[in-house]
């Protein structure tokens, strides 16, 4: 029984500017399958190797798999669908499987537009995939698909079937990833010129922000034993020569006690590896006295979800942090030798040239080491997407990549929005390149920042940054001719829209019922009041009792 996993060849000009990122999903899935007795698992990274369709076809033909599996975030969905179609063209008997967050919630539409997909794994994939592979191995899968929990498929009569959800894996430490399945020499983090990994510290989130779907996908918040996470990192460092890692969690500092234990264990092991995280301003302020410990443990890069600059916008997005809190959190990190990156969301409905300029001025005032302006992108399966309703005009999911303006502001067209964002980038990083980075006193921070600048300049020179080459942007003189090439024929079909708008009784999460957002009379912006946040919104904290409860479930 041979299982072939393929990472689809999708590129967007976003996170890739820092290097090639190892697809951790395949290591966790392969490790779980091998522990379950299925050891013939092969991986092809079509994205990192930039494989053409013909090359993918050749790989499948040569490897002769029984099952081909792909994963897909929203912008990669069409590439994943095409990859699985190629597998069926090579051999119609191959069982084709799609996983990932997009298929989990958009399965009615995916199965309609890609009928060659035999099954979609919904949510956490390890146990579902093991059950599916077992059914295929026993020759009963196609006849008994309804007996495999956690999948969706199209029945012979065309009806879309979603089986009951598979319970989340309570003890994540049962999963031993097979990191050896990856070609590590190809996953280089450009700022440090070292191999990079993305291990899990926890899965899920205890909070239910409307712009996010992590809590909905994982269904339960579970955190790992910090010592076992460090065991995994030690394997990555000593066996695979990894020199930098980023925790995959949206916010690993949620569980304060466990995060402290994680840092203490890293210090104890003295692995000499640097790492980065995403987190919230409120967590940094909460942990002010712990920042020296974090830095001693190797934490070198923190990306903060500050999102919006003008206080008006902070209020509009229901962000319970203030401008001064953002500024203070950034300074605290810098004072402790930690590189800071501020994340801003742009392109809201009320965006203007003036608010974009305010964003730039605020970035200069806060003075983070780096700034990132991401386009406002409502995931089609998020609560936010439903709240926006007919304000969403673009359904070409390949462009849902945070660098393409999906939403059009009322006061400007998309080309001008892109141009002004590029102006912010140019001015911000020119100042850093000539007046700040080379003169940073901390040697390790200076080396890291100059490496980040190298990655930024490299992607700009190659026209890969922000997909500039593909859309035809060459500066302000081209803002009127930029072509985002939206496929206007793509829509959300009625069945998918119905599935998204109703509660799925078979998809139960740990979270209590959410409070429905209602439009305030006369307030045209209220429906997007929770919209413009990457992770970093709000001030919620886990209480000591809640932290203890997660530990009990994991034990």
From Swiss-Prot:
Carries keyword Oxidoreductase?
Answer: yes
**B12-binding domain mapped to chain residues:** 9-143
Keywords from the UniProt entry:
4Fe-4S, Bacteriochlorophyll biosynthesis, Chlorophyll biosynthesis, Cobalamin, Cobalt, Iron, Iron-sulfur, Metal-binding, Oxidoreductase, Photosynthesis, S-adenosyl-L-methionine
UniProt cofactor note? Binds 1 [4Fe-4S] cluster. Binds 1 adenosylcobalamin.
Q: What is its EC number?
A: 1.21.98.3
Q: Which GO terms describe its molecular function?
A: 4 iron, 4 sulfur cluster binding; cobalamin binding; metal ion binding; oxidoreductase activity
Query: Binding of [4Fe-4S] cluster: at which residues?
Result: 205, 209, 212
Q: Which Pfam families match?
A: B12-binding (PF02310), Radical_SAM (PF04055)
Task: Tell me the InterPro entries matching this sequence.
Answer: Cobalamin-bd (IPR006158), Elp3/MiaA/NifB-like_rSAM (IPR006638), Methyltransferase_Class_B (IPR034466), rSAM (IPR007197), rSAM_horseshoe (IPR023404), Tetrapyrrole_Bchl_Biosynth_MTs (IPR051198)
Single Gene Ontology BP term? Answer: photosynthesis
Tell me, according to the record, the phenotype of the null mutant. Cells do not exhibit a phenotype under high-aeration respiratory growth conditions. In contrast, under low-aerated respiratory growth conditions, the absence of BchE leads to an accumulation of MgPMME.
Q: Which CDD domains match?
A: Radical_SAM (cd01335), radical_SAM_B12_BD (cd02068)
The pathway is: Porphyrin-containing compound metabolism; bacteriochlorophyll biosynthesis (light-independent)
What superkingdom heads the lineage? Answer: Bacteria
Q: Which reaction does it catalyse?
A: Mg-protoporphyrin IX 13-monomethyl ester + 3 S-adenosyl-L-methionine + H2O = 3,8-divinyl protochlorophyllide a + 3 5'-deoxyadenosine + 3 L-methionine + 4 H(+)
Q: Which positions form S-S bridges? A: none
Tell me the cofactors it needs: [4Fe-4S] cluster; adenosylcob(III)alamin
Location of the Radical SAM core domain: 191-416
Gene Ontology cellular component annotations, sorted alphabetically: cytosol
- Record family assignment: Belongs to the BchE family.
Q: What does this protein do?
A: Involved in the tetrapyrrole biosynthetic pathways leading to chlorophyll and bacteriochlorophyll (BChl). Catalyzes the anaerobic formation of the isocyclic ring (E-ring) in Mg-protoporphyrin monomethyl ester (MPE) to yield protochlorophyllide a (PChlide a) via a six-electron oxidation and the formation of an oxo group at position C13 using oxygen from a water molecule.
User: What name is this protein filed under?
Assistant: Anaerobic magnesium-protoporphyrin IX monomethyl ester cyclase
Please tell me the species this chain comes from: Rubrivivax gelatinosus (Rhodocyclus gelatinosus)
Gene this chain is encoded by = bchE
